[in-house]
Amino acid sequence: EVLQTNEISVNELQTARQLSRLLDGFYNTTAWQAITRKLILDDNDFLRRFLEFLIDKNLIDQPMSLEKRGLVLYEFCSMHYPAYKIMVTIAWIEAGMSLKKKPAEKVKTKRQMPPEYWEVIYGNYKESLRLCFLPIDDNTQNGYWFGFESEIQKAEPVFKAKEIMERCQNTQSPQINTDKSS
């Protein structure tokens, strides 16, 4: 039931309800909160554009799984905010979503070896971790490393690091270069 008052029209009530669904599905969901917050803060038009996208795709009133919301957000960013795709991919990986789906298409999973230097963001590296690498772009070797516990089959990474090209004085827990020739 929709009521109209002198203060708000039926269309405005509909928009408020749809914005509430958008925020519940993306902002109030831990997996997508940081990227949604960043997009809201960085672009005043984001909420309007994303809401229009969800309405056009007939998704605003559909229940969506965590994975479906990630796929939708990735598709939207691919079309309208390509610079933010990397953040959606990081959120996708950290939420334990499949590394075989589109948001993780650039993730390298086969026989990944740790780099010479990295800055640990969380967790502790150990050789038993299965490493995956997400390059930040196609032109550099810089990117994010994620470590997964193979023996317990945990979907979420237990380790995350950012590759750095050379050792810096102010990094937290970098891997030390043991090569004497450098």
Residue ranges and their predicted role:
Residues 1-42:
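A structural motif corresponding to the C-terminal lobe/cap of the Radical SAM core domain
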Residues 9, 18, 28, 41-42, ...:
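General structural signal for secondary-structure boundaries
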Residues 13, 19, 54, 60, ...:
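Extended hydrophobic/Leu-rich segments
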Residues 23-30, 57-61, 80-84, 100:
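Short secondary-structure junctions and interdomain/linker hinges
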Residues 31-79:
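An accessory alpha-helical subdomain
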Residues 63-118:
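Hydrophobic, aromatic-lined core segments that form the binding pocket/scaffold
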Residues 112-169:
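Charge-dense, extended regions
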Residues 170-182:
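Short, low-complexity, charge-dense intrinsically disordered segments
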